[in-house]
Amino acid sequence: WIMGHMVNAIAQIDEFVNLGANSIETDVSFDKNANPEYTYHGIPCDCGRTCTKWEYFNTFLGGLRKATTPGDSKYHEKLVLVVFDLKTGSLYDNQAYDAGTKLAKSLLQNYWNKGNNGGRAYIVLSIPNLDHYKLITGFKETLTKEEHPELMDKVGYDFSGNDDIGDVAKAYKKAGVTGHVWQSDGITNCLLRGLDRVRKAVANRDSSNGYINKVYYWTVDKRASTSDALDAGVDGIMTNYPDVIADVLSESVYTAKFRIATYDDNPWETFKN
């Protein structure tokens, strides 16, 4: 999965997919009542990027729905996965459940079109704080209450705080999550980070009793760091330059082992090295 980083304006969906992304990451900020409000990152952000592009969250979902609904004039067949980077740092811990509830209602209405031919992309809810695991509970219980539990088949999870892998496993246990787990590791492109924790995550994925289904690394903009991540066995790379990742993947050393995921590839299924 080539994951376009910080896609927060509708116009950027086309831009990143046209550069080779089959997945995008979108920032979601919340108001003080835990409503998802804007797709917005803010300053500071990755080096070389404009930090302030934004839409209202529900407006963005409308654009995303069009981009992922077959038959729509804006449809991109290859856009198959969306990571919502949930900026829950602005919330109190006791608001996490509410945030999950409100997020589910927004997606149900504006993305899934109440279950009637809505957008088809798989969704990863990426949460920066292990203490906010109840966001997952709120999300799940709301879709059940709204009589669309089947949409949970399209939803996966990520804790993005670079926490100890054992601690992440405990948070999933509390949230009752037993699958659909993506594990991120990374740092802003302005700084360097080694691959030690990525290798631990890959080892967990490849073990017989691990909780991780997929591992992705962020934010990778250079050919050398792309090769290093691929050599470590990741499933996804988040980038500001999808064309760079696509180019490295086309090298003969990688074409034998990697290909770009399509809609038929289940993102919750573990593919071991």
Curated annotation (Swiss-Prot):
What is the protein's given name?
Answer: Dermonecrotic toxin LsaSicTox-alphaIB1aii
Molecular-function annotations in GO: lyase activity; metal ion binding; phosphoric diester hydrolase activity; toxin activity
Top enzyme class: lyase
**Which InterPro entries would you find in this protein's record?**
PLC-like_Pdiesterase_TIM-brl (IPR017946)
Q: Per the UniProt entry, what are the Gene Ontology biological process annotations, in alphabetical order? A: killing of cells of another organism; lipid catabolic process
Q: Which organism is it from?
A: Loxosceles sabina (Tucson recluse spider)
For this chain, the annotated S-S bridges are C45-C51, C47-C190
Q: Lineage from the top down?
A: Eukaryota, Metazoa, Ecdysozoa, Arthropoda, Chelicerata
Report the protein's function: Dermonecrotic toxins cleave the phosphodiester linkage between the phosphate and headgroup of certain phospholipids (sphingolipid and lysolipid substrates), forming an alcohol (often choline) and a cyclic phosphate. This toxin acts on sphingomyelin (SM). It may also act on ceramide phosphoethanolamine (CPE), lysophosphatidylcholine (LPC) and lysophosphatidylethanolamine (LPE), but not on lysophosphatidylserine (LPS), and lysophosphatidylglycerol (LPG). It acts by transphosphatidylation, releasing exclusively cyclic phosphate products as second products.
Recorded GO cellular component terms are: extracellular region
The answer to keyword Transferase applying to this record is no
